[in-house]
Amino acid sequence: MSINVTEIVLHQIHQTEGETSELNTVLRDNLLAISPEVEQMMLQLHQAYQSKAKAYGIFKNESIFAQQLNRLLEQETDFLPFSHSCAKMLSSELAKYPFASGGTFILCRYNFLATDYLFIALIDSRTSMLVDDQLEIKRTEYLDITQYDIACRINLTELKINAQSNRYLTFIKGRVGRKIADFFMDFLSAEEGLNPQLQNQTLLQAVSDYCDQGELSAPQTREVKKQVFEYCKGQINSGEEIALSELSEALPTLNEVDFAQFTQEQEYGLEENIPPVRNALKTLTKYSGSGKGVTISFNADLLGERLIWDELNDTLTIKGLPANLRDQLARNK
């Protein structure tokens, strides 16, 4: 798949050395020429971004960034001055956080699969070694374009079609303790939009309720949940979202009401297209839990067969231990 880069620029934000370190911004005075190397870099950044855990946001009414972006989209300003303004705002916001270290600031407007995007990222540089033409070893620096966590992307096509959308802005969820998400929300003056985790949990509840109102037996309910999981798994593998209408077509109609109609009538508040969350969807076909030094995970269809739950006595009986577990127990008895 190819990517079409329309405008791209790089700026530098670096930390000064000394007792009171500060962030300095070095602004490029022209856009990068679009070359095969530039498009290859952006394709790698795009692919890396696709694989990362992301959150959704929307601009606040008073967002200065959104105002600047609107001026760009209305052709009241050019991409270069827009990027200068963004770099200065980013540097100012980044200076408030203890993890501030700077990097290469990338802004790129590109098209992928008939969708226009604005990609913004702060990429770290890494040090490595190379062997030159004289077979001498020298130190070199390179952009770490696969391992980055300060980035956001705006779906310009979605924003243009539906300004009230709650999913046109995405940003990478930060690692624990680094508050990257908070930083980018402040930089963009944005707030939480679509919550994929909540949407997935609501979807699972709707599936359970749908089976209950259809008065399905336990095996029938497990079969429906398995169908839901297989559909969602296929969407994850293909990089697609869960389409409620497609999912509904894959499920049986119960009491003359299909699944999509059921969710609308019961007002679950589900989006027509839902970003799948793998860990949440696993509960469709698996039971798992941990506590007090014990971790248990098993396929749902084994409950009542190889695993017997006694709710009254709070016990779970396993019939037929896994061979490796049995061997460990035998060796250490």
From Swiss-Prot:
The keyword Ribonucleoprotein does not apply. It is found in: Cytoplasm, Nucleoid. This is Nucleoid-associated protein APL_0429. It comes from the Bacteria. Its main location: cytoplasm. GO terms for cellular component: bacterial nucleoid; cytoplasm. NCBIfam families: PRK00378.1. Belongs to the YejK family. It comes from Actinobacillus pleuropneumoniae serotype 5b (strain L20). It holds the Pfam family NA37.
